Amino acid sequence: VHLTDAEKAAVSGLWSKVNVDEIGGEALGRLLVVYPWTQRFFDSFGDLSSPSAVMSNPKVKAHGKKVLNSFSEGLKHLDNLKGTFSSLSELHCDKLHVDPENFKLLGNVIVVVLAHHLGKDFTPAAQAAFQKVVAGVATALAHKYH
């Protein structure tokens, strides 16, 4: 991902304010509520029958935390996202058969959750920078698909 120095500063500065555990669960939960067809990849997570069930589901929260920790790792390697996410791309492609479009959906949900949590600090310029980052991560995760 090509970010200007100002964009990199905005991303790292705002990310330092983020509670990854909280935001991860909320982002994955919102993905499953807003795009219910994505639930098919999470059959083992138990009750996903309603928005409140999804948002309070401990397995959703735990996996969301894991997802956002990986995203956080990617922020440290913006110049090599494909390398950083290579094994996750392979897992999601070959073993889990996740539609790569879902990575874009999750990226957009992450941006919504960041806006919600960061409020006025999440300026249009900051959003533009994060949109570049989530698009880059989605592309990297889709890299192993044929």
Swiss-Prot record:
Positions bound to heme b: 63, 92
A Gene Ontology molecular function term of the record: hemoglobin alpha binding
Tissue/organ expression: Red blood cells.
One cellular-component annotation, GO: haptoglobin-hemoglobin complex
Positions bearing Phosphoserine: 44
Modified residues (N-acetylvaline): 1
Record-linked Pfam families: Globin
CDD domains in the cross-refs: Hb-beta-like (cd08925)
InterPro entries (alphabetical): Globin (IPR000971), Globin-like_sf (IPR009050), Globin/Proto (IPR012292), Hemoglobin_b (IPR002337), Hemoglobin_oxygen_transport (IPR050056)
UniProt keyword Cytoplasm present: no
UniProt keyword terms in alphabetical order: Acetylation, Heme, Iron, Metal-binding, Oxygen transport, Phosphoprotein, S-nitrosylation, Transport
Sequence positions bearing N6-acetyllysine: 59, 82, 144
PTM annotation (S-nitrosocysteine): residues: 93
Subunit structure: Heterotetramer of two alpha chains and two beta chains.
Function recorded in the entry: Involved in oxygen transport from the lung to the various peripheral tissues.
Family membership: Belongs to the globin family.
Protein name: Hemoglobin subunit beta
Name of the gene: HBB
